[in-house]
């Protein structure tokens, strides 16, 4: 029997490139409702939206979601997740999946996959997903986070830089991917064991996390194991810019 899990969707109003992003209309529904709809199609026993904004709270209540108003001073999404897990009274061995509030096209199967992967790997406190990188532009794009894993699928590190650096190949040609190097892009969906979240918050950010602006590096810094599996379905890009929003509107608006 598959272990039950809870989905938490963080939603912040503030956004440098797209203010009020969770409330942007997509084919008649606010984006946060689109994400919530996808999460409810998963096997999650509970789907909760977490926001620090009264406008988002009201919108979510309007379409019938379970929603919590959280503190506004969290350093990261995982810190916010810990508050939610604590307020919901989730057990230390429970699994919670963090689904980003700007992923209206997220496949429900990936939510189920990351939760099942964590349940199947008791040595890990976190599970996440990745997919192959097929073009050199993505490899050199700092907005595409790269991940390297060991033989057991455990993360060695994450970076915005090309990872690993193909020393010999890139000494000459940087216009194509080197042969035989399985470059992978990290997909930002996580499953956590609830008992780990309090430790994560108590540690506070480390210099490596701050340098790359990647909070998962805090876990690796403290020796926490992160299991990384190849996504079973394609993860379409989320919404970061007005251009992304128009693209998603075209997809969902027919």
From Swiss-Prot:
Catalytic activity: 3-deoxy-alpha-D-manno-oct-2-ulosonate + CTP = CMP-3-deoxy-beta-D-manno-octulosonate + diphosphate
Enzyme class: transferase
EC number: 2.7.7.38
Gene3D superfamilies reported for this sequence: Spore Coat Polysaccharide Biosynthesis Protein SpsA, Chain A
Compartments where found: Cytoplasm
InterPro entries linked: Cytidylyl_trans (IPR003329), KdsB (IPR004528), Nucleotide-diphossugar_trans (IPR029044)
Main location: cytoplasm
Alphabetically ordered keywords of this record: Cytoplasm, Lipopolysaccharide biosynthesis, Nucleotidyltransferase, Transferase
A single GO BP: CMP-keto-3-deoxy-D-manno-octulosonic acid biosynthetic process
KW DNA repair (keyword) present: no
GO molecular function, one term: 3-deoxy-manno-octulosonate cytidylyltransferase activity
Pathway noted in the entry: Nucleotide-sugar biosynthesis; CMP-3-deoxy-D-manno-octulosonate biosynthesis; CMP-3-deoxy-D-manno-octulosonate from 3-deoxy-D-manno-octulosonate and CTP: step 1/1; Bacterial outer membrane biogenesis; lipopolysaccharide biosynthesis
Any one Gene Ontology cellular component term annotated for this protein: cytosol
Family of this protein: Belongs to the KdsB family.
Function: Activates KDO (a required 8-carbon sugar) for incorporation into bacterial lipopolysaccharide in Gram-negative bacteria.
Name recorded for this polypeptide: 3-deoxy-manno-octulosonate cytidylyltransferase
Organism whose genome encodes this protein: Pseudomonas paraeruginosa (strain DSM 24068 / PA7) (Pseudomonas aeruginosa (strain PA7))
Taxonomic lineage of the native organism: Bacteria, Pseudomonadati, Pseudomonadota, Gammaproteobacteria, Pseudomonadales
